[in-house]
């Protein structure tokens, strides 16, 4: 719905502005952003991380279409990988290898979430599976939620879970450092 998209864009612009102001050290009237400002300052969270996270939200608001696996992985990085990076910093991690593993954990979680929620997401107009994958099994993007495609979707969900496994293994290497 166009109105929803416009209101989403307006809200995103507000969040970007509040994020920029928090990083600029401006006094924050919003209690959530005042707390956010304390966290980013205390834990030296790079500004690029929350801005990247908001870019992931923008992909949803704009109805981004995922043509390739790289597109899907970019979304996963933006909505979950950078969350792993920020959380690792809050937990005191600074070493690049540890931060990389935290990012991998976020990617693994998001790939798993996508696999779990394929039909539910499609019912609200969000398809995170690569269009290339859907074409391989003959599912038009606008038919992902239809019951006749469940068997083919199960194979794609399994493929996503398989794709997540190396990220989980990588992440487990960094857990001891958190």
Locations of the language-model features?
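Acidic catalytic motifs of isoprenoid enzymes
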Residues: 1-175
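Active-site/pore-lining binding-face segments in mid-to-C-terminal subdomains
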Residues: 178
